[in-house]
């Protein structure tokens, strides 16, 4: 896949390393010259573009048109939304992903066309919520040999199984 990583530092470094293991073609766009020099020195198999990924001409010059995925990792949520919307609307990018600092922006960004908005706080809150539900289940379930098996199956809202008891 052809993937663009826009912005970021530590998270971009980690992500680039993982994506390179998957043999993806990577383009990085970053406005920090020192970071771009670092990336170019460490990775000879990626395109490193120095410039502001919020600028249309920078992304045009980077050659992102028709890419499979754009991943926006800027500090400001608004920048990440702008990058993702620009990628979809102007450059026909198939999928957009971004990080968000404010967990309230996850659902808003997805409503505004970002394919996946990721917030560590949002994910942690959902994990805690799910863990507490499982803990409550375990407290009321009779245990056989101190073992419990809990399965979760997600179904579409129009599935005939919705609201029905499954044995």
Locations of the language-model features?
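Cytosolic regulatory regions of ion transport systems
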Residues: 1-167
